[in-house]
C-alpha cells in the first residue's frame, strides 16, 4: 500500500470495557481523534466494531491496554486480548496502547455523560497518534 492511500485510511481507537466499548476514529491525516460511539459489550459488539471500521476505511485499530496501578494485567485485559485476536482474525491490524487513566482524562475534559467511553477511546487513540508524530 502506498503512503498516499495509507494516509486516507483512518485509525479506530477502542476503550474496551466489560459492559461497554468506546469507539473513536482518527481524521484522514491521522492527526486528531474523535469520539464516535459507545457499543454495549454483547456478543454482537465485534460485528458492530467491524462495521464502524469498514465505514471509516480503517484497517488499523488502537486498543487500550488495561493494566492496574502496578502495571499488571487485570480482568479487562484478558477479555480485550480475546477481542484483539478476533479483530485480527477479521484482517485488522490491532495495536496495543497504554490506557492508564483514560476514562478519568475523558471525564475531566467533558464531564460524565453517555459518550464517556467513546471519549476515553479518543484519549487512547490521540496518545497513539501523538507518539507516531514524534517518530
List each language-model region with its residue ranges.
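Phosphate- and other anionic-substrate recognition elements at nucleic-acid/protein interfaces
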Residues: 2-12, 18-135
Amino acid at each position: 500500500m502506498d503512503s498516499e492511500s495509507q494516509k486516507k485510511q483512518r485509525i479506530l481507537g477502542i476503550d474496551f470495557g466489560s459492559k461497554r466499548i468506546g469507539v473513536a476514529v482518527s481524521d484522514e491525516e491521522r492527526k486528531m481523534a474523535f469520539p464516535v460511539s459507545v457499543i454495549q459489550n454483547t456478543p454482537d459488539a465485534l460485528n458492530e466494531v467491524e462495521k464502524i471500521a469498514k465505514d471509516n476505511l480503517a484497517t488499523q485499530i488502537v486498543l487500550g491496554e488495561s493494566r492496574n496501578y502496578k502495571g499488571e494485567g487485570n480482568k479487562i485485559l484478558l477479555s480485550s486480548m480475546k477481542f484483539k485476536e478476533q479483530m485480527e482474525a477479521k484482517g485488522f491490524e490491532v495495536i496495543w496502547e497504554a490506557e492508564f487513566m483514560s476514562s478519568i482524562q475523558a471525564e475531566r475534559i467533558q464531564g460524565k455523560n453517555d459518550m464517556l467511553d467513546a471519549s476515553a477511546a479518543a484519549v487512547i487513540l490521540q496518545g497513539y497518534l501523538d507518539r507516531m508524530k514524534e517518530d
